[in-house]
Amino acid sequence: MDFSSLVASQLNAGVIWPEGILIITLMVILIGDLIVGRSARSWLPYVAIAGLLAAVVALYFTWDNPKPVAFLGAFEGDNLSIVFRAIIALSTASTVLMSIRYVEQAGTSLAEFLAIMLTATLGGMFLSGASELVMIFISLEMLSISSYLMTGYMKRDPRSNEAALKYLLIGASSSAIFLYGVSLLYGLSGGETSLSAIAQKLTDVNGGQSLALAIALVFVIAGIAFKISAVPFHQWTPDVYEGSPTPVVAFLSVGSKAAGFALAIRLLVTVFGLVSEQWRFIFIALAILSMILGNVVALAQTSMKRMLAYSSIGQAGFVMIGLTAGTDAGYSSMIFYLLIYLFMNLGAFACVILFALRTGTDQIAEYSGLYQKDPLLTLCLSICLLSLGGIPPLAGFFGKIYLFWAGWQAGLYALVLVGLVTSVASIYYYIRVVKMMVVKEPQEMSDAVKNYPVINWTLTGMRPLQVGIVLSLVATSLAGILSNPLFTLATDSVTTTPILQSAALATHISRAN
């Protein structure tokens, strides 16, 4: 074997060809904007969407790859990473549809916005499969820095600037905390950076039990908890969600959060397997706090964006039930819930964006009487919100059932009961919005709705944002009907990923003892 063949076999770059498609798409957008100029606005977003969908198709063809390890072990292209990378790519494609009209109305460069968003997507996708410390940190910062830039993209809006500054300061602090935990792992393992090598070295040294390892665990969890908006590392979420451009908020609530959970699974399961009881205990506490605070504080919100911000904190708590279960059913239900959360949450944000573009407000009280002026928007928003609340037979109901059942089977009875109670509480603030939209008395109609312009929902007259809303509605509805195939997909991604099978076996043995 010659040198070039040896290098090619070691790098195995074909594993990341979905990301390669996105890199080419990013270059086309930047060069197209440079050459064509402002007239490129009409086709650049669709190039981005086409590239993202092509990346999802490429991910499909890498399923069950017999050689998933790439770049000398720095990246794992296993089925677990494929599912998370697909979630992130699909969330970005939906967000691009939402962004076109929003960015144009703000008078800022659409090409630059798309370039930053695709960079964040690349960071999230690389983070989902990263299995080496340097790769993890570079991917994490690639995602984080792009998110900071998108948050402050509307530079003429003081709220956007404030949100970006808060996000930057708190995000930089969390990155430093996470990096300190990672540096402890590097030192404890004697200079290893591969996650599997670190796990092996930690096992050889004192059986993995040491004060330094416990400190590293706490710092790493703090960094991950910031990314998934878990209480008490959630302080940035309401202010950043309220002040940021709404399409950016939609991406942060799904794409960024999915990347955070992918990192949590791979890092905690691989490196901290010997202290799995400890990190599960910490995540049980985080889940309880997130579900209670997120859903209770959401009851008092008057802004749709702040309500959805606290809702996303509560939703993160539900997802953590699957993570703490540590079983095949737990991981599968976690992935399944993120798959349907993608559709219902992005659908809700798309409706909020359209209403804000038409009325200039996101206050909940201003939605009063919307059904009389825009029945289809009311229907779409109602279905997405009720699905988030877990109302049967919508997709969110099946997602929560799977999560709660996995937690119950794992013996997490108190956690499941808290989840059930807070889920019931969340239904109130979702139904409150729905009830407000369908009031029939003209005197109860808000001023914003009274002046609501006529919207064309015909097939030929819909704008990209309206297409995104309809697609989200269809996807949310189909996710409820086709919950079994989606759950089978999630289960297959777990049962064919070696690190999760080893972790599930270890968890079963420890509980049996």
Swiss-Prot record:
GO BP field: ATP synthesis coupled electron transport; photosynthesis, light reaction
Reactions that this protein is recorded to catalyse: a plastoquinone + NADH + (n+1) H(+)(in) = a plastoquinol + NAD(+) + n H(+)(out); a plastoquinone + NADPH + (n+1) H(+)(in) = a plastoquinol + NADP(+) + n H(+)(out)
GO cellular component, one term: plasma membrane-derived thylakoid membrane
Main enzyme class: translocase
UniProt keyword annotations, A-Z: Membrane, NAD, NADP, Plastoquinone, Quinone, Thylakoid, Translocase, Transmembrane, Transmembrane helix, Transport
GO molecular function: NADH dehydrogenase (ubiquinone) activity; quinone binding
ATP-binding in keyword set: no
Subcellular location: Cellular thylakoid membrane
TM annotation in the entry: 15-35, 43-63, 80-100, 110-130, 133-153, 168-188, 211-231, 245-265, 281-301, 307-327, 335-355, 379-399, 401-421, 467-487
Membrane topology summary: Multi-pass membrane protein
Chief location of this protein within or outside the cell: membrane
E.C. number: 7.1.1.-
Function: NDH-1 shuttles electrons from an unknown electron donor, via FMN and iron-sulfur (Fe-S) centers, to quinones in the respiratory and/or the photosynthetic chain. The immediate electron acceptor for the enzyme in this species is believed to be plastoquinone. Couples the redox reaction to proton translocation, and thus conserves the redox energy in a proton gradient. Cyanobacterial NDH-1 also plays a role in inorganic carbon-concentration.
Family membership: Belongs to the complex I subunit 2 family.
Assembly: NDH-1 can be composed of about 15 different subunits; different subcomplexes with different compositions have been identified which probably have different functions.
Protein name in UniProt: NAD(P)H-quinone oxidoreductase subunit 2
Organism: Microcystis aeruginosa (strain NIES-843 / IAM M-2473)
UniProt gene name: ndhB
